[in-house]
Amino acid sequence: MQIERLESAGFFSYHLAEHHTPAVHSLAPSQNVFLAAVSQRTTRLRFGPCVYVLPLHHPIRLIEEISMLDNLSGGRMEIGVGRGGVIEAYFWGQESDIEVNQARYMETLEVVLNGLSHDELNHKGEFYNFEELPMRLRPMQAPYPPMWYMRNVETSAINGMHSIIVGNLDGFEANVKRYKDLWEQYQGKGRLTAQGEEPKIGLVNHLVVAETDEEAIEIATPAWEDYKWNLGIPRRLEVEKRGLTQFQGENARMRPANQPDREARRDLYSELESTEVQQRRANPGGLEHSAGRGAGAGFGVIAGSPDTIKEYMEEYVATGANYFVASFQWGSLTHEQTMRSLELFATEIMPYYMDAPVPGSAV
């Protein structure tokens, strides 16, 4: 029902994350199974994983299933990729070394893109070797479906992918500028994606829309607390129970040596954020009271009436982003609460922004 309403409301795409046990929010661990159902319940809505955790997948299986989904949907597949974390790799019986994890991600991505865009696959690498392997299934979209990368604008732009940022509005304008500058530097000024699209960049927004600010905040607050708990506590408890010291402390936040450091970008283009703008963004329409904007795991939640959400949307549009990612169901929000929020957003807010950032939905 939610998926069908997203389509009828005019959303561009639906993005589905990949999470696995012991995470509590691992209720759709097989994205392709779920998205196959989506392909049959919709006719226009685009969809895709955001992201496939590539080190956990065999590239041939991904090539085949991506091709199946693109054909089942009539060419509506979008592909998000990422390396995930070494904790997930460990629980899946893989190496817990971050450099090995990164190398596996890079090679899997190379094989997948090669296989999707050629009739025959040839590859010789550290983890996989294929010689003159026929690619019997090919995606409808050439050379392959649109590509997305999450969290790191540097990696997205350098590799010619659309970008989705996880965080809050503070500093997002700097991320947008960084992405556009790097795209121009590495892809070329005015260069489109491999599919001929304008590169998109958006921010995940956890939304609750209600008739009044007070009602929205009342709904959002307990749901947000549950969401923050679900994100990290079960995995942390499992790590502590097993005595996995390599995943504790600073080591849990290490990045591969050859990867752009997304933490450094917090200070990039800081001149764009004047004191006045920062203060205004810290309290747009009183939204900081809605379960704590930006609190917990780098995420933020926006809760309010349609008029309050419109105020937030004005600031979002002003960042220069051209994609808006809305998450309507998270934490302990019920289906009824989610549908009401989605309905208000679709009828009271979206009509004002149909020529602004393209709307997408993420779960």
Task: Set out the residue ranges of the language-model regions.
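N-terminal beta1-alpha1-beta2 module of alpha/beta enzyme domains
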Residues: 1-41, 45-47, 142-145, 363
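Conserved, mostly hydrophobic/aromatic
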Residues: 6, 18, 38, 69, ...
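Structural preference for beta-strand elements that scaffold enzyme active sites
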Residues: 13, 44-51, 76-80, 146-148, ...
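Glycine-rich, proline-tolerant flexible connector loops at the mouths of alpha/beta enzymes
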Residues: 13-34, 38, 53, 85, ...
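Alpha-helix-loop-beta-strand connector modules within alpha/beta enzyme cores
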Residues: 25-49, 104, 342-358
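Active-site mouth loops of central-metabolism enzymes
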Residues: 52-60, 141-151, 207-210, 295-307
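Internal, glycine-rich beta/alpha segment that forms the wall or movable "lid"
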Residues: 58-161, 166-177, 181-197
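An alpha-helical appendage that flanks or caps ligand/catalytic pockets
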Residues: 99-135, 172-318, 356-363
